[in-house]
């Protein structure tokens, strides 16, 4: 009886799942957010603070917070961590010079108590650009295989065309089903 009630509750319960979208400046975070919410590319300028949109997929509601990635704003990322279920890290696959900064910020986040149960989705953005880093290279640079206490997935994407974004959302949806 308890299992049946749980399944019925899940069908009608439209719980909101908090997602934060982080990454260095110019990685494509805002473009990805608006691809999710409007399915189109919008003109963006550097995010000061955050943008927030509700995305509904198959009766599952995600409240997505796109947080500014400039160096001066990164120290305030932790103010968004409370109740976060998923962290989306957007990596600019063309930015070889700052991949080590991305790694440093990633591990700083993962060590935070408020994110101990959060799933991690890495979007390797700008895969349409010639000579960008591959998903395998980014995975190696970020040392993703060393992450043992978080479920994680890396997904190649192009924010401008939307390619790869649905696969990332599908991974998040699959994580919700096994909870």
UniProtKB/Swiss-Prot annotation:
One of its GO terms (cellular component) is cytoplasm. A lipid is attached at residue 2 (N-myristoyl glycine). One of its GO terms (molecular function) is GTP binding. Keywords: GTP-binding, Lipoprotein, Myristate, Nucleotide-binding. One of its GO terms (biological process) is vesicle-mediated transport. It comes from the Eukaryota. GTP binds at residues 23-30, 66-70, 125-128, 159. The keyword Transferase does not apply. Gene3D superfamilies: P-loop containing nucleotide triphosphate hydrolases. NCBIfam families: small_GTP. Belongs to the small GTPase superfamily. Arf family. Lacks ADP-ribosylation enhancing activity. This is ADP-ribosylation factor-like protein 5A. It comes from Homo sapiens. The gene is ARL5A.
């Amino acid at each position: 009886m308890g299992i049946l009630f749980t399944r019925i509750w899940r069908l009608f319960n439209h719980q909101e799942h908090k997602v934060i979208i982080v990454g260095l400046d110019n990685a494509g975070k805002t473009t990805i957010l608006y691809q999710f919410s409007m399915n189109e590319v919008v003109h963006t300028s550097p995010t000061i603070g955050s943008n927030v949109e509700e995305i509904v997929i198959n009766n599952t509601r995600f409240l997505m917070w796109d947080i500014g990635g400039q160096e001066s704003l990164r120290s305030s990322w932790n103010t968004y961590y409370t109740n976060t279920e998923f962290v989306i890290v957007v990596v600019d696959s063309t930015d070889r010079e700052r991949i080590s900064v991305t790694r440093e910020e990633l591990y700083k986040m993962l060590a935070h108590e408020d994110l101990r149960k959060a799933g991690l989705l890495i979007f390797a953005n700008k895969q349409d650009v010639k000579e960008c880093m591959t998903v395998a290279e980014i995975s190696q640079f970020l040392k993703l295989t060393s992450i043992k206490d978080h479920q994680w997935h890396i997904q190649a994407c192009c924010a401008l065309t939307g390619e790869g974004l649905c696969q990332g959302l599908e991974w998040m949806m699959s994580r919700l089903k096994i909870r």
